[in-house]
Design a protein with these regions (language model features):
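Helix-adjacent hinge/juxtasegments
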Residues: 53-79
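Auxiliary alpha/beta "docking" domains used to position bulky ligands
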Residues: 50
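A general structural-boundary detector
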Residues: 11, 53, 89-92
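Generic structural motif
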Residues: 18, 42-44, 59, 79-83
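General detector of N-terminal leader/presequence modules that precede the first folded domain
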Residues: 1-47
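Cys/His-clustered metal-coordination modules, chiefly Zn-binding fingers
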Residues: 72-97
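A generic local secondary-structure boundary/capping motif
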Residues: 25-28, 64-65, 87-90
Length: 97
């Protein structure tokens, strides 16, 4: 198993259904960032069997509507100084613009 170090600063997008991580990666334009971004696919998960996970080593605004449409079960964790300071559980958006 590959180990990816713990984030000191940034965002973790977790509980992504296996196979949906790359779509989220593309829709959020993470390939255009100059910061470190890690997409892990098919990670073992006791809850989900397998899941995808994205770690972003920077703070940025995320479009929760896009995330909620692609995978409404995603959780977003904000990390500061190595500690999770906020965790958001998404749900599908009410309307799409």
């Amino acid at each position: 198993m590959i180990n990816v170090s713990k984030l000191k600063e940034g965002i973790v997008i977790d509980h992504i259904r296996a196979g949906h991580g790359y779509k989220i990666f593309q829709q959020l334009g993470l390939d255009k960032l100059d910061d470190v971004v890690v997409l892990m696919r098919n990670v073992d998960s006791t809850k989900m069997g397998h899941k995808d996970l994205i770690k972003i080593e920077t703070h940025l605004e995320l479009n929760f509507d896009v995330l909620g449409l692609i995978d409404p079960d995603v959780t977003i964790s904000y990390i500061r100084e190595g500690v999770r300071v906020n965790k958001i559980k998404l749900s599908p958006p009410e309307t799409v613009k």
